[in-house]
Regions:
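Nudix hydrolase/Nudix homology domain
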Residues: 108-166
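Conserved N-terminal beta-strand and adjoining loop/helix that marks the start
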Residues: 1-19, 65, 88-92
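Residues that recognize and position ribonucleotide moieties
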Residues: 12, 33, 119
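Generic short beta-strand segments
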Residues: 68-74
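Unchanged
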Residues: 40-63, 74-131
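Structural signal for conserved beta-strand scaffold positions within catalytic alpha/beta enzyme cores
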Residues: 21, 69, 119-122
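Conserved Nudix-box catalytic region and its N-terminal flanking loop in Nudix hydrolases
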Residues: 18-56
Length: 166
């Protein structure tokens, strides 16, 4: 089976039991909660990617970042003959509360924005049905059970619509 690699840089902002997430609109994580972040541009450093992606997807300015770490997951969508090895660099971030929040644009400089906006998700409401593998990794970490080894999702379901809350 073919394995494609994807590398991205993502923000972990956890306050008062809630995780800052974005609502994905396309791709394998569509209609799921995901972390703010994404792919690097040519010549861009990790923290430059981090701050740019957070601004584009949430409108927030990152004040500080710390605790860099890397996780990975293997995702094979239902009925696909390839798997994606998603490698993620994560940083804990604090937002600059004094900076004005920028309006999120549907179109960003590198194409169409793939998020509907941001949401503060209660960590207890995050499930495999409503979240991306990235968010699930972070949830485990925040609950004190970090999954340091690779995780496999062999029949990943791409949601056609947003899951309903129970």
């Amino acid at each position: 089976m073919e394995i494609k690699r994807h590398f991205g840089v993502y923000a972990v902002c956890f306050e008062n039991g809630k995780l800052l997430c974005i609502e994905k609109t396309r791709g394998p994580y569509q209609h799921r909660y995901d972390l703010p972040g994404g792919s690097q541009r040519l010549g861009e450093g990790l923290t430059e990617t981090l701050t740019r992606e957070v601004m584009e997807e949430t409108g927030y300015t990152v004040r500080s970042y710390s605790n860099p770490r890397i996780y990975d997951v293997f995702v094979r969508e239902e009925l696909k003959n390839f798997m994606v090895h998603h490698v993620m660099a994560l940083y804990d971030v604090e937002m600059d509360e004094d900076a004005p929040q920028v309006t999120i644009s549907k179109a960003v400089s590198d194409g169409i924005n793939d998020s509907l906006g941001y949401i503060w998700m209660d960590i207890q409401e995050i499930t495999e049905e409503n979240a991306s593998p990235l968010v699930l990794k972070v949830k485990s970490e925040l609950l004190g059970f970090p999954e340091l080894d690779k995780t496999f999702y062999m029949n990943w379901k791409v949601n056609d619509e947003k899951p309903t809350s129970s």
